[in-house]
Design a protein with these regions (language model features):
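Conserved catalytic cores of phosphodiester-cleaving nucleases, focusing on short active-site segments
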Residues: 51-160, 177
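Structured loop/turn residues at beta-strand edges in well-structured enzyme cores
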Residues: 48, 140-141, 171, 197
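A short, highly charged nucleic-acid-interacting micro-segment common to nuclease
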Residues: 1-21
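A short acidic/basic microdomain associated with nuclease active sites
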Residues: 27-47
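Short, flexible, glycine/charge-rich loop motifs used to bind or transfer phosphoryl groups or to couple energy/partner
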Residues: 42-44, 133-136, 165-167, 190-192
Length: 349
């Protein structure tokens, strides 16, 4: 399979998935590592800015401790409860800092948190008291943002330049990169475009037939600057926003693209590309984007029930096989990142 079979004519979706899979297995780009674990997510950000790929560099022990709170994201309301829950029983209004909005919303978050088992709750003297199940760990070390532009020509660079400059100025991410497809020239065209000097440039060459890790060759064409502000430690708003972002990455990962596609279509397939599994449409005879893979697609056909029959009644539902496979891959990666789980099979994806 050629790269053009995954991201034809510079299409970003397939390129983005390959970059995510590479980052999951090989981050950081320079090959050096401080022993960080990594979580990779895609299409993640804030109300004002969304990044193509987000890499969360984590403390391995902290990431393992984060697992105590489950596999799902803790949203901002739950984080407010879990981070400040006391070691001993206390009325929730005494235990938690004022949120800046009515306490009834905090009370609802307390009930949700207790329902998920991330805090303990009891009623005493007609008051709701809470107690933590474990200290919420300091598990996030750095957040890296990556913009994926397989065809970074002059017009694409101009459109992206202002966004990258804002990323550098706001410094919500500690490091910003642009990922592009390698051309094989002596000087990659991306180096000649209008990209802020603080932004790193990664050039990728993918080869599905190459053995092992050689399927993805990432070359650092320009090293980024660390844009972490000097007062980062004392900036509580920045810390909270980054933690919310990291929690969304933890809950979603990058394989959640099936949530915006139609894996319940009989034409939806996953095909191996190197060490990645990428979507493929049998009706089109090639890759599909999330926008194309929708119920409005003229080639959409429901998955035949016989495909998921294991006796009677039918097990699961339409598209559950695809979703289960992607979920299993994600859980394998999570186990690999936890220090107490031991070695994992390098052939997984």
């Amino acid at each position: 399979m050629r790269p053009s079979d995954v991201y034809p004519e510079g299409a970003e979706f397939g390129f983005e998935l390959l970059v995510c899979r590479w980052a999951e297995a090989a981050w950081p780009p320079d090959g050096g590592s401080d022993g960080d674990a990594v979580i990779v997510a895609r299409q993640l950000g804030t109300k004002r800015r969304r990044w193509d790929t987000v890499v969360v560099e984590c403390d391995p022990a902290g990431l393992a401790a984060r697992a105590r709170f489950g596999d799902r994201e803790l949203d901002s309301d739950l984080l407010h409860v879990v981070r400040h829950a006391p070691a001993e029983w206390a009325w929730y209004r005494d235990a938690l800092p004022h949120p800046g909005y009515p306490w009834r919303y905090v009370r609802a978050a307390v009930h949700r948190a207790a329902g998920r088992g991330v805090v303990e709750k009891r009623r005493r003297n007609n008051r709701i008291e809470i107690r933590r199940v474990a200290p919420y760990p300091d598990w996030v070390r750095r957040i890296v943002a990556v913009e994926n532009k397989p065809d970074l020509d002059a017009s694409a660079a101009r459109a992206l330049s202002d966004q990258l400059a804002r990323d550098v100025d706001t410094a919500l991410a500690d490091e910003v990169w642009v990922a592009t497809a390698a051309t094989g020239g002596r000087v990659e065209p991306a180096l000649l475009e209008d990209v802020p000097v603080e932004v790193g440039i990664l050039a990728f060459a993918f080869d599905a037939d190459a053995p092992g890790d050689a399927w993805a060759d990432a070359t650092v064409e320009w090293h980024p600057s660390d844009v972490t502000p000097a007062d980062a430690e004392s900036d509580e708003e920045r810390t909270t926003t980054r933690l919310e972002l990291a929690e969304r990455a933890y809950g979603a990962g990058w394989r959640s693209y099936h949530d915006t596609m139609r894996p319940d279509c009989r034409h939806f397939e996953l095909r191996r590309y190197g060490r990645a599994l990428v979507p493929h449409c049998a009706a089109k005879g090639g890759p599909q984007t999330a926008a194309e893979c929708a119920g409005s697609c003229p080639d959409f056909e429901p998955e035949p029930p016989v495909w998921r029959t294991g006796g009677w009644p039918v097990e699961g539902g339409p598209g559950k096989g695809i979703q289960s496979l992607l979920r299993d891959r994600r859980e394998w990666v999570r186990r690999r990142e936890y220090p107490e789980t031991g070695d994992a099979d390098a052939g997984e994806n």
